[in-house]
Amino acid sequence: MKTTINDIAKAANVAKSTVSKVLNDAPTISEATKQKVRAIMKELQYTPSSIATQLARRSSMNIGFLMNFDRKDDFLNPFFYSLLGGAESVTFEHQYELTISNINNRDNDFMNQYVYSKKLDGMLINPSVLDKDIAKELERLAFPFVIVGQPKEDYGVGVTWVDIDNNAGGSMAANHLLEQGYSRLAFLGSNPEDPISHSRLTGYQNVVSSLREAVDSSAYIRLGEANEAHGYRMMNELLDLEIPPDSVICVNNFVAFGALKAASDRGIRVPGQLGIVTFDNYPLAPYTTPAITALDIDTFNLGVLATEVLFDKIEQLEPGRQFQSIKPELIVRESSRRK
């Protein structure tokens, strides 16, 4: 039987009028009472018709871009600013405002601040700030949101996310190196929990494992922080092997810059003795010596796509789309060109 407002009031030991005021976020109700009532609503899986109606018809003319500001590396990467530019271009066309908000998945006030308050019509969410409970609650309320980047876990059929086709990119990089005559391909990635790095690694492994004379690729895989220092350290580890790799795919161009420096410090010629390919073309890849072959990721267009899909959800045009991807473009430069 469907849960009613009477059930909520009884379970919370408050009056029906108090529940109604909580639904309307009335300032006369204490935050403690609001949180208590909302927790019971969630527990009893109650979707108030008033919220559903207001979410559908009342517009704040504002969408949120939710990031975890604890992840400082995200803000050092130009990827973030290009992505924002794409999102803002679509938001502007719809005469909406784009609000950047700091949140992490440990913030218990997430739903109160952004959903029940009706301050936003929809959200673009970085995977690092989302967990399964929040995703389920947003779906239950039919609140429009799009995850920008591959989620760490399966949130369910109704959840939509957009990303670069990182798996295809890993395969493109590996195939390019093979075409150039390299045979011992290595991979420098970020931490194992990072779904982006994992997808890029999977694309690389799909190609390497299919080789007629397959090598043990696990010996040529190193994972760590995605920065220059770790790129330098991981590349040196590989070069210390009895049979070192003759080429390497880097998860981003910060790691590639570290790998290139490691080779240079050892007097290893690139591309003669070591081929290097990186994900991300900007900012370092075109300006190193030699210039690094890169998988160019159109992050501006990724921001455009994510925001267009979000507005489709807000306007209830295509709510069922679960995954959209953009294929990277391989830009061949001196670091891997043998032919």
Outline where the language-model segments fall.
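N-terminal helix-turn-helix DNA-binding module of bacterial transcription factors
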Residues: 1-61, 337
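Short hydrophobic segments within beta-strands
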Residues: 66, 101, 126, 148, ...
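Short acidic/polar active-site loop segments enriched in Thr and Asp
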Residues: 15, 61, 121, 182-185, ...
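Hinge/beta->alpha junction and helix N-cap segments in small-molecule ligand-binding domains
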Residues: 69-80, 100-108, 161-172, 188-234, ...
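Alpha-helical recognition/docking segments in bacterial nutrient-uptake
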Residues: 58, 62-175, 238-240
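Flexible loop/turn connectors
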Residues: 234-339
